[in-house]
Amino acid sequence: MSNCPKSITAFELNEWLNSEIEDPIIIDVREYSELEIASFPKDFLHLPISKVSVDFVKTKISDSKGKKFVVLCHAGIRSYNFGQWSLDNRLVSEIWNLEEGIDGWSKYIDQKIPRY
C-alpha cells in the first residue's frame, strides 16, 4: 500500500482517459463556486474539501472497491492533502493527484476551460 498520493500530469491523465484502460474515478475537491468557473470536462465525483469527513467520503465511494482514483483541485495542493488524508484513513489503497489541478488541465489539455 502506498503511503502518499502518486503524481499524474494533465498529459498522462488525458492519455489514460483516452486509452482502453478502465477510466479512474475522478474526484474534484474544489468548492461549488470554483466548479461554476471551471468544471472538469469528464464525469467526476464532487467532494468539496470543506465538507469532507471519513463518513461522508465512505458513503460516496463505498461501491468503488478496486477502482483507481485521481483527485484534483485548482492547483494540486488541496487534492494532494485530500489524497494523503484518504490514504491515512484507509479510505483508498492508491490515489493519484493531478499535478497543477484544473489549472494545468486548462493550460495543457483544454484551453476552453477558464483559468482563475
Show which residues each predicted segment covers.
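Rhodanese-like catalytic fold shared by cysteine-dependent sulfurtransferases
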Residues: M1-P24, Y32-K68, I77-Y116
